[in-house]
Amino acid sequence: MAENKKKPNINLIKKVSWPNDLRPNPDQLSSVTDTYFLRTRDVVAEFGDTEVTYAIFMRRPVISALNPALDWLQHIIKERKGNVNINRCFEEGSDVGAGEPMVYISGSMLLLVDLETALLQKIGATCVAAYNARSMVESLRQTSFLAMDARHCAGTDMADLMAYGAYIGSQRVKSEMNAIGFIGCATDKTAHLFQNTKGLGTMPHALVGYAGSTLKAAEMFHSTWPDQPLTVLIDYFGKEITDGLMICRSFKHLANNGTLSLRLDTHGGRYIEGLDVAGSYAVLERNAPESIRGYRLSLIHI
């Protein structure tokens, strides 16, 4: 790998290992590659190879989060017993402007031409995820974030990449200022990115429904996992305030030692207990008028 041309914008990004089941493997590659790349490879094989250089860029600002993609590329090149020159323009976690090349990849066209599909799949979304994670952590510096990518992604490969993006974006902010950032993810596979051995999480809505009450669900969970911090989902019955206070009173000892949390996972179609649309606006107007006025103004400008 050639030496980086631009210094990183961050102090330190901790080196982490990446899941070793990098896909697609050489046997799977042709079935998930765009046909026109496969046909181009056949043409090059027929009429003669040549040296090429790929410049990979994004059409929008992102955070550089290339390691999974480049690790996969180097794995495939090694399997093919070939060589390429990889020249990174940005260190991991650095700002990348729209249209700026992030990395140059040079080598045999025959070796590289059918790798573009899988390579780009691992770059675009990951870099955007890192950018979004950075924005979240920067905006709410004293908030702990949990990466819940697993159930929202189109497969485990995408979930791995989203967890990595969350890690990079979070580390970027933490290297520059005092911020908590992402403290974990939902699954064991990528927990090491956040210096954990296991995924984090307590209860989905299904457990509250199974238990029949918010308090009963909390009691059942705590009985089963007494040494785990307790995060209680309090919106199942639409009584967020009533159930939230009940949980705090019932688990006062956990609240006192900082291991009790309340979780809201309410969709945008309803409002917190006792409020409706008008009531919600009235609360904002009384307590934080600039928040909703600024939001409305930004919508008008958009």
Question: Which residue stretches match the model-derived regions?
Answer:
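Flexible, solvent-exposed loop/hinge segments and secondary-structure transition points
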Residues: 2-113, 117-126
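Conserved small/polar residues in nucleotide/adenosyl-binding loops
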Residues: 300-302
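Buried, small/hydrophobic-residue-enriched core segments of structured protein domains
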Residues: 2-12, 92-96, 103-298
